[in-house]
Amino acid sequence: MMRMCWLVRQDNQHQRIKLPHLEAVMVGRGPETKIIDKKCSRQQVQLKAECNKGYVKVKQVGVNPTSIDSVIIGKDQEAKLQPGQVLHMVNELYPYIVEFEEEAESPGLETHRKRKRSGNSDSIERDAAQEAESSTGLEPGSDSSQCSVPLNKGKDAPTKKESLGHWSQGLKISMQDPKMQVYKDEQVVVIKDKYPKARYHWLVLPWASVSSLKAVTGEHLELLKHMHTVGEKMIADFAGSSKLRFRLGYHAIPSMSHVHLHVISQDFDSPCLKNKKHWNSFNTEYFLESQAVIEMVQHAGRVSVRDGMPELLKLPLRCHECQQLLPSIPQLKEHLRRHWPK
């Protein structure tokens, strides 16, 4: 019985790639992956399968960002890719998963294969999409316990217009969809986060094309102020009667290409809050306060993000109210109940 590992493109654009045990395999732009995007290096990642341990070591070799579950690995840095996680080759594009199989040869019989997956294919795509932060049709204040997402499969799956991105395209479409809009004016639109990490979780997006915080200049100062004002309006209009505390801010390294302001209640009462990366993205310096961003642009004309931000996502789980350390997400969630308003 021999264990094998395969790299599988989720949109089935090419045949799966074999990753031999402990053998370094370079993957990137080229005929094998059918990736022609020049932002993807020919040697974008180095993959080394640990077949006995059930994961793949991923080293980002290319300049542009490679991510696992929307967390950027970083140039010359390594991360583990496990079954159920999604590797985006570059710039949140070209999604891959890994599959482990046990192969046994029997005389006169075809090779018998058992595929090891973390859940079914639907759950894999659903978890991958969670980091995309696109919108949902839920009404403000409605039950956030439903974290399902309709899936595009087969010929209906988006394979063209790759410049928009596999997941970011969904966000831009949601901005334009009246059913998804909670509020809009001439400058911004507000949509409900598709995978809310708390009872209330909105995204405020400008109509103007601003790719990320790195693209923000002094010319965007009034827009940032307006986005903040609209975020406060959402709290007043839809959560004013609650005693919940809110924060407004941006992820230092967002998973989406279109800049967006998070407006999120501090209860973190949501089944979509599933792992340490989710928690730390909102409860460490990875989450940049909206007012702090405004002040940076006001004084320096740009937003500065310090090095080492991805490492913050790996920090131990710590309660944001009392600073107590918790060993797991379920225990953290149980602990948070004591801090909810009575």
Swiss-Prot record:
Gene3D superfamilies tied to this protein: 2.60.200.20, HIT-like
Record-annotated FHA-like domain positions: 24-73
Ranges where the record places region Interactions with ADPRT/PARP1 and NCL: 1-96
Residues recorded with modification Phosphoserine: 118, 123
Matching InterPro entries: FHA_2 (IPR041388), FHA_APTX (IPR047289), Histidine_triad_CS (IPR019808), HIT-like (IPR011146), HIT-like_sf (IPR036265), SMAD_FHA_dom_sf (IPR008984), Znf-C2HE (IPR032566), Znf_C2H2_type (IPR013087)
Motif Nuclear localization signal boundaries: 112-117
Polar residues: compositionally biased ranges: 132-149
Segments for region (Interaction with DNA substrate): 193-197, 255-256
Catalytic activity: a 5'-end adenosine-5'-diphospho-5'-2'-deoxyribonucleoside-DNA + H2O = a 5'-end 5'-phospho-2'-deoxyribonucleoside-DNA + AMP + 2 H(+); a 5'-end adenosine-5'-diphospho-5'-ribonucleoside-2'-deoxyribonucleotide-DNA + H2O = a 5'-end 5'-phospho-ribonucleoside-2'-deoxyribonucleotide-DNA + AMP + 2 H(+); a 3'-end 2'-deoxyribonucleotide-3'-diphospho-5'-guanosine-DNA + H2O = a 3'-end 2'-deoxyribonucleotide 3'-phosphate-DNA + GMP + 2 H(+)
Zinc finger intervals, C2H2-type: 317-339
Catalytic activity, EC: 3.6.1.71, 3.6.1.72
An annotated GO cellular component: nucleoplasm
Domain HIT: 168-273
One GO MF term: DNA-3'-diphospho-5'-guanosine diphosphatase
Highest taxon of the lineage: Eukaryota
Localisation per UniProt entry: Nucleus, Nucleoplasm; Nucleus, Nucleolus
Domain notes: The histidine triad, also called HIT motif, forms part of the binding loop for the alpha-phosphate of purine mononucleotide. The FHA-like domain mediates interaction with NCL; XRCC1 and XRCC4.
Function: DNA-binding protein involved in single-strand DNA break repair, double-strand DNA break repair and base excision repair. Resolves abortive DNA ligation intermediates formed either at base excision sites, or when DNA ligases attempt to repair non-ligatable breaks induced by reactive oxygen species. Catalyzes the release of adenylate groups covalently linked to 5'-phosphate termini, resulting in the production of 5'-phosphate termini that can be efficiently rejoined.
Name listed for the protein in its UniProt record: Aprataxin
Organism listed in the record: Canis lupus familiaris (Dog)
Gene (name only): APTX
